[in-house]
């Protein structure tokens, strides 16, 4: 690379800002950040995001309104960058790196160093880095997922049914959700192409194939079976009920 710029996200600093800033100061977003991201788009910088929570519970008691306010300002100011990224004008990839706190949540029976080593083993296996030729393995995997997308497109799938028979607190299946697709749905998977024809993998690992739903054809309900972290806050048992594409009830 001609030049590597490193951005470091620090959760304790983020917490300090959210706790001690004056409310109006939460709307501040420096102009130099806007210009830096604009240069990255203009010059088509590649982006590698290495993610791993060092303090996975540190923001649990922070005001969610303040967190949402900071996030919304950033999204608004950098919308052009996110649009360029989602349009594959830039090469980008998100990959996971173990941290002691995260590793011990996954392997609570192990000491910190042992848990980190074990999580490294799992991650390197899931990204095929433990195979003799990882690049060739990823090309095969990418092609397999592309075959799945072609099959789904050819058969004109009309809807997806997400069903989890595990009984919930009310005795009903945990999830029973019908997601209707558009009349001419498109399917994507794994690798993406830049306008110049450069192929890249935005996520490692990646196993999904995906499409876009019709905005009025989702009906039923869904519960999360694993913890999720919107705005870096741990949420368990999230529940959403849909009617004609709209959320009519939710809980967690």
Identify the meaning behind each predicted range.
Residues 1-217:
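Active-site bordering "gate/hinge" segments
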Residues 201-239:
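Conserved AWS/pre-SET-to-SET junction and N-terminal core of the SET lysine methyltransferase domain
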């Amino acid at each position: 690379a001609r030049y590597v710029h490193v951005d470091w996200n620090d959760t304790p600093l983020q917490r300090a800002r959210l706790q001690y800033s004056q409310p109006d100061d939460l709307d501040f977003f420096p102009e130099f950040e806007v210009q830096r991201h604009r240069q990255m788009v203009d010059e088509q910088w590649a982006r590698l995001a290495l993610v791993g929570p060092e303090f996975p519970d540190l923001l649990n008691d922070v005001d969610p309104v303040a967190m949402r306010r900071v996030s919304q300002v950033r999204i608004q100011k950098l919308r052009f960058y996110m649009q360029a990224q989602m349009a594959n004008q830039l090469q980008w990839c998100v990959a996971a790196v173990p941290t002691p706190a995260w590793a011990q949540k996954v392997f609570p029976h192990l000491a910190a160093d042992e848990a980190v080593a074990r999580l490294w083993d799992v991650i390197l296996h899931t990204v095929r880095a433990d195979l003799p030729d990882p690049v060739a393995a990823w090309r095969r995997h990418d092609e397999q997922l592309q075959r799945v997308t072609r099959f789904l497109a050819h058969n004109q799938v009309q809807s997806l049914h997400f069903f989890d028979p595990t009984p919930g607190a009310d005795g009903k299946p945990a999830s029973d959700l019908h997601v209707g697709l558009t009349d001419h749905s498109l399917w994507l998977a794994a690798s993406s192409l830049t306008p110049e024809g450069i192929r890249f993998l935005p996520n490692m690992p990646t196993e999904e194939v995906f499409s876009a739903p019709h905005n009025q054809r989702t009906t039923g309900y869904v519960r999360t079976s694993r913890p999720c972290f919107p705005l870096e806050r741990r949420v368990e048992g999230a529940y959403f009920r849909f009617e004609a594409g709209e959320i009519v009830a939710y809980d967690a």
